[in-house]
Amino acid sequence: MEVTFFGTSAGLPTKERNTQAIALNLEPFSNSIWLFDVGEGTQHQILHHSIKLGKVDHIFITHMHGDHIFGLPGLLTSRSFQGGEDKPLTVIGPRGLQQFIETTLRLSESHLNYPITYIEIDNHFTYHHKGFSISAHLLNHGIPSYGYRIESPTTPGTIDVEALKSIGLYPGPKYQEVKSYDNFEHEGQVYNSDDFKGPAKPGPIISIFGDTKPCQSELSIAKDSDVMIHEATYIEGEKTLANNYHHSHIEDVFELIKQANVKRCLITHLSNRYNHENIQLIKQQLKTHEDVPNFEFVKDFDTFII
């Protein structure tokens, strides 16, 4: 799996960074792509990447602020002409999302050539799709804002070739049956497939947060995440300001990483007051502290393998 950032700025775009948009490539579990938030200009950012809109079959919106949704109408209409014809799309997000999209399309006399299924969240939400389990929890941002927890499918254990050879079964087409079914038959005897496979490997857990100040529900979303994507609008000494505006300070994120046992944190939604040089300098200063957890400040077009 891969995650790519098409926008990493908070509130307003800058010369270096666009507003919020994240793409999650589900391979090898699926050939689909999921988008999380679609800030203004997202479709233009995607033109600089190999991602195709026709492969996007789910869009998740964290909240209804403009820097997270103003790119939606244009991206949806462009999808009609970029491989999305007749390919269903599911759009998930807070109440009002369907009205925003349909009103914009109606007033602009725009027409889509594919169906959209809308799912609007009210406080808490659980969704299952092709082995993935997605849950959404309400955060604290003044308006309804959600964090998404994505639990990937479990990968079956690898075949124990030596164990199969011990019963006289050598590499061949029968091995696919061992991989795919609970039981298999060999020379008149039925065997349990699990006895000839290594332990199953849990898929990665990814948590993606909308804008929020610290709140209890963050722990449920982030717990044991292999990758957590979190906002830190304020990364210097502006903690009171972060709290007043229902945002997170970098120290808040560090505390969550430790409490939730997060393996890796990718920090986005940085205030537009910071340029690339500022961010790198602050990062170097933070890395000098012994108790700083594993984190990265991300920039537009960064891609990370999960």
Curated annotation (Swiss-Prot):
Transmembrane segments: none
Binding of Zn(2+) 2, residues: D67, H68, D211, H269
Cofactor: record remark: Binds 2 Zn(2+) ions.
UniProt catalytic activity: Endonucleolytic cleavage of RNA, removing extra 3' nucleotides from tRNA precursor, generating 3' termini of tRNAs. A 3'-hydroxy group is left at the tRNA terminus and a 5'-phosphoryl group is left at the trailer molecule
Enzyme class: hydrolase
E.C. number: 3.1.26.11
Keyword line: Endonuclease, Hydrolase, Metal-binding, Nuclease, tRNA processing, Zinc
Active site location: D67
Amino-acid positions noted as binding Zn(2+) 1 in the UniProt annotation, renumbered to this chain: H63, H65, H141, D211
Cofactor: Zn(2+)
Keyword Methyltransferase in annotation: no
Database matches in Gene3D superfamilies: Ribonuclease Z/Hydroxyacylglutathione hydrolase-like
Pfam family for this entry, one: Lactamase_B_2
UniProt-recorded Gene Ontology molecular function terms: 3'-tRNA processing endoribonuclease activity; zinc ion binding
HAMAP family (alphabetical): RNase_Z_BN
Assembly mode: Homodimer.
UniProt xrefs under PANTHER family: ZINC PHOSPHODIESTERASE ELAC PROTEIN 1 (PTHR46018:SF2)
Main function: Zinc phosphodiesterase, which displays some tRNA 3'-processing endonuclease activity. Probably involved in tRNA maturation, by removing a 3'-trailer from precursor tRNA.
Family per record: Belongs to the RNase Z family.
Name of the protein: Ribonuclease Z
Species this chain originates from: Staphylococcus haemolyticus (strain JCSC1435)
Gene: rnz
